[in-house]
A protein has these predicted regions:
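Short, well-formed alpha-helical segments that are part of the catalytic scaffolds
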Residues: 12-25
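A conserved acidic beta->alpha catalytic loop
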Residues: 22, 36-49, 94
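Short, flexible, basic/aromatic active-site loop/helix in glycosyltransferases
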Residues: 118-119, 133-152
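Short aromatic/hydrophobic "clamp" motif used to bind/position activated sugar donors
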Residues: 87
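Non-catalytic, C-terminal membrane-associated alpha-helical segments of glycosyltransferases
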Residues: 221-225, 238-309
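Conserved donor NDP-sugar-binding/catalytic core segment of glycosyltransferases
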Residues: 99-131
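Acidic donor-binding loop at a coil-to-helix junction in glycosyltransferase catalytic cores
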Residues: 177-186
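Glycine-rich, basic loop-to-helix element that forms the pyrophosphate-binding segment
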Residues: 66-82
Length: 309
């Protein structure tokens, strides 16, 4: 079975090179792996690197330029060019083991999955030793010990999606270009429509975390944004679910109050548990203030010294 493998990228040449080289090294795949790199930098900064690597790719390697900033724009442009029955997504800060594609496809076939997710193992270059376990967990993705159907969904990096489910020109919501969460909205809708979601326990990838991201200044706003997911999803569907949203807002208020004070006290005391507790408080606050979006992508990355880059 052939598969389209999409790598959206934004001004991350070293990460893109690592991701591509790991894809070139894939083994055990019976069908074609058609690679699509979608460059989301306005200046098209990845073009030269992709053209340099193309002769040694061993697979079809297509470069696309989506100059309009936004992760949803980049994903949508790449999806339009995908012609295979399934699409794999790998981020430009991820590296895949040589059997990754084969294991993702194997999980799809074993469970007749519409969507497959795999684990992510964070690799930190440096971090405050006191909070290192928290940062490793924050940037990693964990799931069941064994492969099989799951009731929930994860993020787009290290996922496989049935191409037929990505209908229209904009399967990823472009209103989420700057704040992210376009994948959450898509997967929520697919789940509501009965899509079969599966976990591939052995199909992991590594994610490289730069020093600029291994800080509470970066992770707590991200935790806030992650916390917004349930409330936002309740109001984004058709029909809207205000009672469900109200439930999550109340849940978030309690969470923010309970963990906020405790987290600040632990941080003042120098406890290594502070980061984990403050993270819970931030996620609770996100459930409550779900309508206030923080920019992490798109035009936010065009500002001088954007967070986490």
């Amino acid at each position: 079975m052939s598969v389209s493998l999409i790598i959206p990228t934004f001004r991350r040449p070293d990460g893109l090179k690592t991701a591509l080289n790991s894809v070139f090294a894939q083994t055990g795949v019976e069908g074609a792996v058609n690679i699509i790199v979608c460059d989301n930098s306005p200046e098209g900064s990845a073009r030269a690197e992709v053209e340099r690597l193309t002769p040694g790719a061993g697979q079809t390697l297509t470069y696309l330029h989506e100059p309009n900033p936004g992760v949803a724009n980049a994903r949508n442009t790449a999806v339009k060019a995908a012609r295979d029955p399934f699409i794999l997504f790998l981020d430009d800060d991820e590296e895949a083991p040589s059997d990754w594609v084969a294991k993702m496809l194997s999980a799809q076939q074993a469970f007749d999955a519409d969507v497959v997710f795999g684990p992510v193992t964070a690799r930190l270059k440096t971090a405050d030793p006191k909070f290192r376990p928290y940062f490793e967990a924050f940037f990693s993705r964990f799931g069941p010990a064994h492969s099989g159907p799951i009731p929930d969904y994860y993020g787009c990096g290290n996922s496989l999606i049935r191409r037929a489910l990505l209908s229209g020109d904009q399967p990823f919501d472009t209103n989420r270009n700057n704040c992210g969460g376009e994948d959450d909205k898509l997967f929520y809708a697919l789940k509501q429509d009965g899509a079969r979601m599966v976990w591939a326990a052995d199909a992991f990838v590594w994610e490289d975390v730069p020093e600029s991201r291994a800080t509470l200044r970066y992770t707590l706003p991200r935790a806030f944004a992650y916390g917004q997911g349930p409330s936002t999803s309740a109001m984004a569907g058709t029909p809207k679910k205000p009672l469900t949203c109200a439930y999550w807002m109340l849940n978030g208020l309690v969470q923010a109050v309970l963990f906020g004070g405790a987290g600040l006290a632990l941080y003042a005391a120098g406890s290594k548990a502070a980061a984990r507790i403050l993270d819970k408080a931030a996620r609770g606050l996100g459930k409550l203030i779900w309508f206030h979006k923080i920019g992490f992508y798109g035009t936010a990355l065009l500002r001088p010294n954007p967070a986490g880059r």
